[in-house]
């Protein structure tokens, strides 16, 4: 953020200045003998954002597909730049500046890892990454309390874009499968069949029926659909109706039990769910950031079952956010 302010302030006084030169000047003044490596860090990250073929909009984490941008290769490269910077430092103030950037880096990578692990249904591992992020956050707070953006309580309570909010979501999901309030039956597959429905043909043609061959695509349910190519040439995500479908297996000992279905995260304003052709849920999505539960009817059967989901995402939400982006699972409540 301080680099952004530095560049913006310089450009406010003289908009013809060269941005590369401003960044170089900033690094020389702020990082001293480590400046060259920090400059490499900045431009490698900037290039990764610039070169993504997905829609990117600064100001909201939902509009930046960080999990696509931060590849393992990029993470390793950025850490190598920081390691080289640490080796070049001798002046205490510059050392502090590099240390702070390293903690920012630790915090960001741990936070992103926790988000990805939560989307994949690996909640125990996500909790560990959240703990790592908390350590980095604590280290930053000891340097200065305002180094990380302040998040008011309403943001924490309604969003997964803060560490505290993500921790609450992860614990909510974990409690449903680890015996706290329920036990896991099965995770639904990561990969589902998928089809956009811009002309609302799906209900008329009954796409929820068993074995409907309508030319489905295949997507993962751990990323927004925009992050998987469903966007226009300008980079804005698909807006309208879309359908998901998959099959799942249920063991004999679960048949006739009070099974619940939890969606870890769905971005869309209205949702329909069919199990074995029966509509079991239709309603407004109260929060695109938070999980929600559905009590399933008795038509869950031992063996193979089919689930179909219809989602309506309308024009209020723009950018890289649409569809199922955290894994769904079946569980049995303790009571």
Which residues fall in each region the model found?
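Accessory carbohydrate-binding/adhesion or oligomerization-edge regions at the termini
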Residues: 164-232, 246-249, 304-335
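Short acidic/histidine-rich active-site segments
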Residues: 1
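Catalytic domains of carbohydrate-active enzymes that cleave complex glycans
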Residues: 7-189
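Outer-membrane beta-barrel proteins
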Residues: 234-236
